[in-house]
Amino acid sequence: MRLFIALPVLIVVVAMTLEGPAPAQAAPDLSGTLESIPDKLKEFGNTLEDKARAAIEHIKQKEILTKTRAWFSEAFGKVKEKLKTTFS
């Protein structure tokens, strides 16, 4: 009984294996892939730009980050003034 079930299953598996990949699984055409690369790179660049702009806006709007930025600007100004007076 097991042989009657196993043999057709084995035949189906071998037939599927020898048939090759389905059209959706087949390797894509190289020229089609090369043609789509610029579009994908442009899309990636636009997405990256949007995310970077959103992150910068988010940083600008945070209160603690605004205070930190002001403190760094003030400290940099003091160091700049100190160097200016020292080397003048």
From Swiss-Prot:
Range of residues in the leader sequence: 1-26
Tissue expression profile of the protein: Adult and fetal liver.
Superkingdom of source: Eukaryota
Main location: secreted
Keyword Signal: yes
Pfam family, one: ApoC-I
GO cellular component: endoplasmic reticulum; extracellular region; high-density lipoprotein particle; very-low-density lipoprotein particle
GO biological process: one example: chylomicron remnant clearance
Keywords, in A-Z order: Lipid transport, Secreted, Signal, Transport, VLDL
Location in the cell: Secreted
TM ranges: none
InterPro entries listed in its UniProt record: ApoC-1_sf, ApoC-I
Keyword Secreted belongs to the record: yes
GO molecular function, one term: phospholipase inhibitor activity
Family recorded in the similarity comment: Belongs to the apolipoprotein C1 family.
Function: Inhibitor of lipoprotein binding to the low density lipoprotein (LDL) receptor, LDL receptor-related protein, and very low density lipoprotein (VLDL) receptor. Associates with high density lipoproteins (HDL) and the triacylglycerol-rich lipoproteins in the plasma and makes up about 10% of the protein of the VLDL and 2% of that of HDL. Appears to interfere directly with fatty acid uptake and is also the major plasma inhibitor of cholesteryl ester transfer protein (CETP).
Alphabetized PANTHER family for the sequence: APOLIPOPROTEIN C-I
Name this protein carries in UniProt: Apolipoprotein C-I
